[in-house]
């Protein structure tokens, strides 16, 4: 009896083990959380990932679009594995003891150089940047890297005092969606617009530009501006290096899909983004570009804006760009 019970128990165990092996679920993918700027163009960059065109057997990218203040607030909390962040955030975070590691460049000036313009109304009396002395400029984020690049161009090319205190112009921060209205109603004399607004303003014929500062920076320093990068934290990299390599691969391939299929991607984001289908292609070519990689020129651009920030009194010192870029970053 005891022998038969033992045999039955052994058989039951073997049967259970075999059943378990036969029905074991596929191992769950590692999750990489990614916080990025809320913008229709960024949805285009991530289109191939979200549509399952670019896949991975190893990781799942969980993305969340955030406004600039939320991105800034998320940096010290380490809420996200990867965060789209300002180039200026790297030395500023280091000053507070927080080290950030660059995985790739996220916003690089488009070859057309149409970003970072100083806009005025078509019938405005202002003809040159010198005419804006004593006038008010509306801006979407005074402390952003994009604005720091603009100020550097105005300082170097137009010899303007760009200090926020007692400078040549009065700078006013206004929520981005309200900038064109502020310009139209005369609340401000000039404005720096976000890319989607600049695209609409240029197409309307109701506004003109006194300075394309991205072009000015290229002329002065020989680099395309880099305003944002994708960053993570050293301890996260150390814990899961292969997962972050896979993240970089997927992001880069998603960018390449968007580059090769701009009409498809543009039409898709136009449905939800309330923007023209042609905007995405124009954004990549003329306004900004999301490399998903790092070039030597990007490193030079980072060091250029940090040196400019030191000159303008924003920073006391600046790091070497090569020291903050991950050794496994995708390189151009």
Model-derived regions, located:
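N-terminal export leaders
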Residues: 4-10
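Pocket-lining segment of extracytoplasmic ligand-binding domains
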Residues: 88, 165, 177-268
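Conserved C-terminal helix/tail region of periplasmic/extracytoplasmic solute-binding proteins
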Residues: 303-332
